[in-house]
């Protein structure tokens, strides 16, 4: 029973080197691909047959073994195994790398997983990996301590040596000084002696000279002097004077003076000599002290330098820590300081070494957990990020070192093929070039390492190998992308996966299929609704194998080969056989773009001549097809099951209602509408008007005889009643003999013919039938015939004969569809016939210009002139002038349109086309017969110059030029809009694709209030909005209190009518928004399936339907941002598609409204040209004190007091009363016998309103507002709204806002589709405090999973986690889905896969995309039935294995325990549980198992 794709979950993880080697069939050692002479793969090369398998089926490389009989033999000569060549699509090889290489996804992804794990910044990590920096990978702590001590000892020694040197120098200096001073003293004594001797000699000389002179004078005493007599230059006696005793006395005096002067000079010289010696001594002493100081300083600086140096080097040694990044210089310096203490390395090898040696995940997780709980801010954030990665590795069983590759897998050669082109050249996959680079560099590196090449060369080669592997895995992620010939970027393995051309979107989600073709479509007016015309040539090609088999069966050919020849020669019998084969066979028709599920429908093929496919005109609306050259594709469902499914679910006649709105999508249009309109018109005064007929047959006979006109009003007596309103008089007559009602009716032959084509219950419609009327007929027909009360058993038996016995509801649905389809076909035939008979056509003369036009234009011109005059006089501003003129011309255009309308001939073809809504509208007509009006310029601003002409008159050159703006803008908008709408649809599909109806009832009590008051806002009737919902609470008659319907009753048409009659204005209904189903949605919350009009079935893919319903009309939405009045102002509102994207992406809107943050009173303030809006919340607290009789207040009424102030005291001295004291601060109020203090607490929130912002209606001074209310006009920011008003308010807001956009464009979508998407946007919660759960702060968790986990924790007495609701945009929500396959196939493929691989994510294949990707049936529709059947089979097997007596089974008695557990796990996954958790199956599990089957428990169950 276990098949290759019979699994229920798929896991992705990192591959270990052992895994890679186990996948490999051999090592690729050579870069060669194929030999260009023999065109055979080279041995050990990238296409080697020995490794990857033979290139030809059952044939080895050398040709020794050929044919299938040698299957499995390995050739002894060439080593190739004889097998099928398709193994070359699955066999892998490997390259053993000479040096480890990092995987770029884990290095360059954000956040860098390797960086987080090692706590290294991505920049530093990159520098290590690409050999720019070293990383310390090993530290010998013992050696480090020794090195530290040695260094300290060395510097201690150095310091001592320097101090000793300094001391010896000091001693030397002192000795020198003492010597110098001693020398100076002896020199001084010598100098004194010399001076004494000198002066003694001089004294003796003077004395001798005086003595000589005295003796001369004594001799000549008494004589007159012959000449002047001098003594040492002084005149003693002049010439002629007599020498006397006085002269001798004078000589003695002079001698004494001379000797005294000499003595003084001697003393002076002695002093000078002494001073000189003193100064010299001082100088010497000063110099010595200076030298001493210098020595001291030098010593100190030397010591300081040593201390500094020691400190630096000690710091360097201390900084030797694991994971430290070093530059080349730092590495060299450290190696000198601390040789042998550490080992530093670079490249991926170093990182791998580091991880293997140092990372203990359990210990690291514990440390990080402590950090998360004990720190705040940035540190906590970082610890959380790191913890997330560590936990991922711990839980998944992946090893961190596997992020570094030592063995590189080589993908199978047929996935990177090489093909020969015409000119003998070869085209090859880029991957081969990238692999070749890796192999070349790897081989070169091996050779260099063998040769012991210099480190720098080896290192460079290692870096180049790293870059080659990076380019192979993800080219262009780091540095410049590797490009091949012609500068084109080579496509790497990552590029093979991502983007529209990647594996996911190109080959897994969408494939090209066989048994298909395409051709142009033409209209098939004679086809039935469920038929299509298939060209014979096409059918023969499509059904070739079937035809060949039938030819053999019928004996036209003996074997398939000859049958093939017959078909190729197109013998006549082929066509008969083809007719037989194709009878009752369904084909699928598809028109691209497939915007919704009705773009692919099944039809019975009808063989036709020609080459074009014929399509029924009524299904064009569903396909959005027309016949102006559209093409459609045909697909053949091959298996019986596929045929059955196509017939039951996809046949066009069973897809009559639009899944988006529930209205008929099979609506007659254009010619059919025109024919029916023509047929049901009344033309008073036409031939035969007013005649009376006794019966319908009589009237028809008169028409056949040409007595009355088809549109003439006549009176006819008939049986039955008028259906709905009648636009002509009706007189009821007495019933006929069977009791059937009869009436006399004014009608026309046309209406009789028309009603004859209607089914009995839908007659008699006596009014003008336009497009809307035809739609009503189809809708009424479907409603009538799908209602079981209107059907007989015979009716149901008809369907049973076709489809076997089914639930009565299903039978009614099929019967209703059959009847509606036949009704639609009858209307189609009738419409076409009478459109032809009526001969309505259109000519230029039918476009009549109303005579009033000139007057309207003249009036407008006059008013414009007046406005211009006022502007010139300065009475109005430029802005006002522009607005006035635009308004005048808009009014003129409206009046012209009205005039065209009135002037139209109601029986003219143009009026008939417009009024019947067959084609065109009054605005187009107005442009043809009235005036074109105002145009807008390329920016969307309205040009004030109107186009006064119409197309009938023709435009002037200027008018034509002005009108081209609008035309071109329209085309550009359409092109852009289509792409945008497509992308929006894709995002919506992705966010909702796993929303499938999985269970009957989730049991929630919550729901959604729908209010009549919202009608105006969302432009839809209250009745329409509640129809098809289920009640979440009983519906009560507001007047009598009578219960009209109970909880979980469907609100059908009858109940809706009752609500309207009783004017009930609010209903509490079940809604997808409130659904609590673990996976998907429950039937009750979803309600009615709009495509069938019945309660939704289990297995319906409601998420996809919702996304298609919103995305499909996306192209109709306008792209541009509207400028109201044409001028940019505060009420610039984004509309159309950009607004829808804004809503679903939960972005901050343009022109965001300011919301009130608290409940309170509005105060509008203006400060320095700044407008501020203040919201003040006040709360009053009153503290009353009773005043006893003899107490008097000591404060005045209205006074402000503080806490503790005296309020009143006794006025009588004899009574010693305590004073009354204020218990709170506030304002005093004195009343009769009491005194109160009123305290006012104010909370104020103030916002600055932009100049352009307009206040929201009702916002003025003193207005009361609630939190979340608009203070200014504009769109609210949904994130703000979520914070202020909570989840429900934001849900309602998003649904209503999206509806506003669609309805303003006239697009109808049911609310529930938008609700399904909004539910997905609010699915996640962000963890704030993890409590005792294993969540991390900031983690995004599914809300149902969060509630379940908390309940579990509380039941065990633990502390639950806290979280806040998150509103995610659809892109973000798609990427946070539980399925990694769905997320990876959506966007950011590499990021999603990186994350999934590290966490070892398991995809339980619950959504549609993931099942399509791996090629399983989707779990929707018949796929869910298949899963249930499979589950039942497994239960059967378990029942056989499990003993019915006890749940506990002894290990030894259960040899098949593992197989049994695997079965049980698969069962759980099938019925919607996890692989590991039996609790999550919404109760279906027990229902499936029943009473008598006992399921043996898991190990973990036993522990629990």
Swiss-Prot record:
CDD domains per record: RNAP_beta'_C (cd02655), RNAP_beta'_N (cd01609)
Family that this chain belongs to: Belongs to the RNA polymerase beta' chain family.
Task performed by this protein: DNA-dependent RNA polymerase catalyzes the transcription of DNA into RNA using the four ribonucleoside triphosphates as substrates.
Chain intervals with Basic and acidic residues compositional bias: 279-294
Cofactor(s) needed for function: Mg(2+); Zn(2+)
Molecular function terms, GO-annotated: DNA binding; DNA-directed RNA polymerase activity; magnesium ion binding; zinc ion binding
Xref: Gene3D superfamilies: 1.10.132.30, 1.10.150.390, 1.10.1790.20, 1.10.40.90, 2.40.40.20, 2.40.50.100, RNA polymerase II, clamp domain, RNA polymerase Rpb1, domain 3
Region described as Disordered: spans on this chain: 265-294, 1468-1504
Catalysed transformations (reactions): RNA(n) + a ribonucleoside 5'-triphosphate = RNA(n+1) + diphosphate
Protein name (Swiss-Prot/TrEMBL): DNA-directed RNA polymerase subunit beta'
Keywords on record: DNA-directed RNA polymerase, Magnesium, Metal-binding, Nucleotidyltransferase, Transcription, Transferase, Zinc
Organism: Roseiflexus sp. (strain RS-1)
InterPro entries with a match to the protein in the record: DNA-dir_RpoC_beta_prime, DNA-dir_RpoC_beta_prime_bact, RNA_pol_asu, RNA_pol_N, RNA_pol_Rpb1_1, RNA_pol_Rpb1_3, RNA_pol_Rpb1_3_sf, RNA_pol_Rpb1_4
Gene: rpoC
GO biological process, one term: DNA-templated transcription
Annotated residues for binding of Mg(2+): 626, 628, 630
